[in-house]
Design a protein with these regions (language model features):
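ASCE P-loop NTPase helicase motor core
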Residues: 259-261, 265-513
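Residue-level recognition of short, solvent-exposed, well-ordered loop/turn junctions
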Residues: 406, 638-641, 657, 727
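Conserved helicase motor core of P-loop NTPases
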Residues: 418, 422-645, 651-653
Length: 797
């Protein structure tokens, strides 16, 4: 240890001096020749905010472990160790050395954008997530040396040689901190997750199914059930397929929901993907009914033979409480509309679950550990598990799901492949669905689908070289939520396919679309002050008059008038106008809370960034102060009546999950213990003997209300504005997306698409510069991973 310290002292420097980076004033090769010089360089990058302290500590750990075993690591190995840790913090599962060496600056996003603000926006926060970035002028450019400068001195082959020679690196057969698989370098934990998921998928895809033989009794029952559940449809328009333009005629009679049910029914692992309103929930409910029909018919035959059998045990889950509540709301109605009496197998309502839980609750989370109660040694009691909003599930959680599933259990993933990937490392759904637009169904699959569904599969979906995974992935291609002329639909498709053109942008500026308006689209570079004034006014009113036809005259799918777009005055007025008091019942207060929570969800501001004038922190403060000036809230800081809050961390003691939204009320202090424990903050009028309580909807979808004292809430923030990431799993009648005045690495096509598709009926856009919208659409989220390669048979170990 003393020897190491002496060596360190030889390279001691003052971070405040111009000699901040050794290699900036000397030969860059020094950092790749001496371990201590390399670690000094990492320290400098960390001090500048380019990488995290965790990344530096990991490199130091590799050094220490290697020294303990008597062989000092090459500085290049330490550099790569720090960079793979950095990339995991940015959501990547690994570092592909070939990609890294081809363009290190772009791969690493190091250095960040050259301007101070953009550079700060690219810096991951100290908690380790790169998804919510901010402008911070205190972080500076650490001289001239960059990771790309160091990596330019070596080749991919030299990296491989150094890594293969390092004691801390292995191909996975030994326990080492780093795993090298081909040219992909992993932290061991994430390599194990990837392998576990791939093994779980492949094992399920290989399991024989009684449905595979189209002449079997089970297949006949499935076909009969699907014919009951799906009536013939008219022409369906393809959505989001790269090949659709060449194949529209061949799709005229294809019911993609029916095809998805058939494909998913015959495989122990299946994925159903589709954009908003394509009927993922409806499809999976019909799928479960069809599976129970097959199970019921089999049960009847077994009972006739004196054998025992059972229906499937089915569980429904979602990544967040908010997503679970949404699925709860929609699935109950979908189940109630099923023609169960007409199905074979005596399917009853009780056979189709309607209760949705979070993945954390399903797996049995435990405090202070990422390990769950259910695992390989204590698997779930389940035959079929359905996970909605699967795009939000990171690699770690997906591995935990596979660990907790019995080998015979069927896993069905639902989600939109084009939405933002999970906050933490991985893009599991996106990687599984890479080939979904073009199907790649084998001739045997095509023949089976024809036999079961009586459907001719379009030629563009057929591929004699299709992979096993392709046969278990189905894509829904028609949106039932948005009308043909919907601006939300048109804009989302243009963003998703990168086909934005001047005409589409002009229609948004002119409010030609009936449901979309770009509020400041005519101003190429509006001032910050004018944009903030626009945001504040929009937050209050929703700018109904800015929409086509003043936001009036639109009808929903049932021919009923749609309510016009609103702002936050809508829910705050509802709170101010009620006449409840200490004589009112808890039930009456609950009903008011339900109405207010529903009114609050009618409008939501979404941001790409967390900090800075364009981020949620700055805008929440700005909007609160404006609402206070408009006398819609009593104060703009602390706890107050009307304050909306977003839970930012799971609290299992309170039953609150990350993403849950509540509204603060002033309620009578004598309402009883069900309102919450603890004195908490007093209300804004001390003389009324009232207390502040936060109303949250229960996560079981029942519509009940839970009242929590503010003093018991630990991880939360005000939520007049939320990040697009936090909005996943939610939808709002009117969504306003606010984009900054310049492009940053987090402003991507996936983020913009996700923001647009959170809008159910109305979408408004405010930008700090008109160019950022198109420029952001041109940037894609590409996360390094090896899952697809492993599933395609790329086994290098």
């Amino acid at each position: 240890v003393s020897k190491t310290r002496n060596v360190d002292n030889q390279f001691a420097f003052d971070l405040d001096e111009t000699t901040l980076v050794i290699a900036s004033s000397r030969d860059n090769r020094l950092a790749l020749q001496h371990t201590d010089a390399l670690l000094k360089q990492l320290d400098a990058w960390q001090q500048a905010g380019w990488i995290r302290p965790l990344d530096v500590r990991f490199a130091q750990l590799i050094r220490d472990l290697s020294n303990e075993q008597g062989r000092a690591p090459a500085p290049l190995v330490l550099l790569l160790a720090a960079l793979v840790s950095h990339q995991v913090g940015r959501g990547h599962v690994c570092v592909d050395l070939a990609t890294l060496m081809a363009d290190a600056a772009a791969t690493l996003s190091l250095p960040p954008e050259e301007s101070t603000a953009a550079r700060g926006q690219n810096k991951a926060n100290q908690a380790g997530s790169d998804q919510e970035l901010f402008a911070d002028p205190t972080h500076t450019d650490p001289g001239q040396t960059r990771p790309s400068d160091l990596l330019a001195q070596v080749s991919v082959q030299e990296c491989l040689v150094a890594l293969n020679d390092a004691l801390a690196v292995n191909d996975g057969s030994l326990t080492t901190p780093l795993v090298l698989s081909g040219t992909r370098l992993y932290l061991r934990r994430f390599w194990r997750y990837e392998q576990y998921i791939a093994d779980g998928i492949q094992q399920r895809l290989a399991q024989p199914s009684p449905l595979t033989d189209p002449l079997s009794t089970a297949a006949a029952t499935l076909s009969q059930a699907l014919n009951v559940l799906f009536r013939p449809q008219g022409a369906l328009n393809s959505q989001n397929s790269q090949s659709a333009s060449n194949s529209q005629d061949s799709q005229s009679s294809v019911d993609y929901q029916k095809l998805a049910c058939a494909l998913a029914a015959r495989s122990r692992f299946a994925v159903i993907t589709g954009g908003p309103g394509t009927g993922k929930t409806t499809t999976v409910v019909k799928l479960l009914a069809a599976l129970q029909s097959v199970a019921g018919e089999s049960l009847e035959r077994k009972e006739q033979d004196g054998k025992k059998g059972k229906k499937y045990r089915i569980r429904l889950a979602a990544p967040t409480g908010k997503a679970a509540a949404r699925l709860n709301e929609s699935i109950g109605g979908a189940v109630s509309r099923l023609p169960l009496a007409q199905l074979p197998g005596q399917v009853v309502l009780a056979d189709i679950p309607t209760k949705v839980t979070t993945l954390h609750r399903l797996l049995g989370s435990r405090p202070d550990t990422r390990k769950f109660r259910h695992n390989r040694d204590n698997p779930l009691l389940v035959d079929i598990l359905v996970i909605d909003e699967a795009s939000m599930v990171d690699l770690d959680m997906m591995a935990s799901v596979f660990a907790a599933l019995p080998a015979s259990a069927q896993l069905i993933l639902l989600g939109d492949k084009d939405q933002l990937a999970s906050v933490d490392a991985g893009a599991v759904l996106g990687e599984l669905c890479q080939r979904a637009p073009d199907g790649h169904y084998l001739p045997a699959t095509v023949q089976w689908l024809k036999a079961i569904t009586s459907t001719d599969i379009p030629a563009f979906l057929q591929d004699s070289n299709g992979q096993p995974l392709d046969q278990a992935v189905a894509m829904l291609r028609k949106s039932y939520r948005f009308a043909e002329g919907s601006g939300i639909r048109h804009l989302a498709e243009a963003v998703n396919t990168n086909t934005l053109n001047a005409d589409t942008l002009q229609q948004a500026r002119d409010a030609t679309f009936e449901d979309v308006v770009w509020l400041n689209g005519r101003s190429k570079k509006p001032s910050l002050e004018s944009t903030q004034t626009l945001i504040c006014g929009h937050a209050v009113s929703g700018n109904q008059q800015a929409f086509n036809n003043n936001g009036e005259g639109r009808m929903d799918g049932n021919g009923q008038p749609l309510p016009p777009p609103v702002g936050y005055r809508h829910y705050l007025t509802l709170m101010q106008d009620h006449n409840l008091d200490s004589n009112s019942t808890t039930g009456q207060w609950n009903q008011l809370a339900k109405s207010v929570l529903q009114a609050f969800s009618d409008f939501q501001i979404l941001c790409a960034l967390r900090r800075g004038p364009w981020g949620v922190e700055g805008l929440n403060d700005l909007i609160a102060r404006h609402l206070r000036a408009q006398r819609l809230i009593p104060r703009a800081e602390g706890w107050y009546t009307g304050r909306p809050v977003l839970i930012t961390g799971n609290d299992y003691n309170l039953g609150l999950m990350n993403g849950d939204v509540g509204i603060t009320f002033s309620v009578p202090s004598n309402m009883g213990t069900d309102i919450g424990r603890g004195a908490g903050p007093q209300s804004d009028d001390e003389k009324t003997q009232t207390v502040l309580r936060v109303a949250f909807p229960t996560s079981d979808g029942s519509g009940d209300i839970r009242w929590i004292s503010p003093s018991r809430l630990q991880q939360l923030e005000t939520v007049y504005a939320m990040t697009v990431h936090k909005s996943q799993g939610s939808e709002f009648n009117h969504t306003c997306l606010i984009l900054p005045d310049r492009v940053s690495p987090v402003l991507t096509r996936e983020l913009i698409y996700t923001g647009i598709t959170r809008a159910k009926n109305w979408f408004s856009l405010i930008t700090g510069a008109t160019s950022v919208f198109s420029d952001g659409v041109g940037q894609r989220v590409v996360r390094a991973s090896g899952l697809g390669a492993v599933l395609d048979g790329d086994s290098v170990n």
